[in-house]
Amino acid sequence: MITKEMIKKVIEKVSEENKKECINIKTHVDENLTIFDSKFGGIPYLPKDFEVPCDSSSNHEQLALLAQINCTDLPENNIYPEVGIVQFWIGRDDLMGLEDDYKVVYFENIDNTITREEVLTKYTPLDPEDYDQYSPFNPSNAEFSLTFEKGVST
């Protein structure tokens, strides 16, 4: 007969065998984020020679920044590079990139001379009238600072 204790041991064994390194993310409200910071939403880092990713529609609308991770903010890990910035972009429509309109970008070398003003000549933030429909954030124009800590998932 199978007992609760036997089931508990099997669950513990399977959990132990399937542990994986992960990085836990915590969000914080921060009104002083730069284009180089790790964040959800906001204004991205964009190198001088980089064009903002666009969707597949005939209008080629710019994608919106979902998240940006500055790899130097991460704890030691075997998941992400040690340096550079990883960005996650999503479509500016009601599907928010769930089908085809998303992109992941990695910049290994960061030009610290680029300014927010330079980025804003290329990147158009979401129109305030579209925030509620096309933003995954609440409030819809929010920008959140990210901090990271090493963890284990089971």
Predicted regions and their residues:
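Preference for intrinsically disordered or flexible, low-complexity segments
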Residues: 1-154
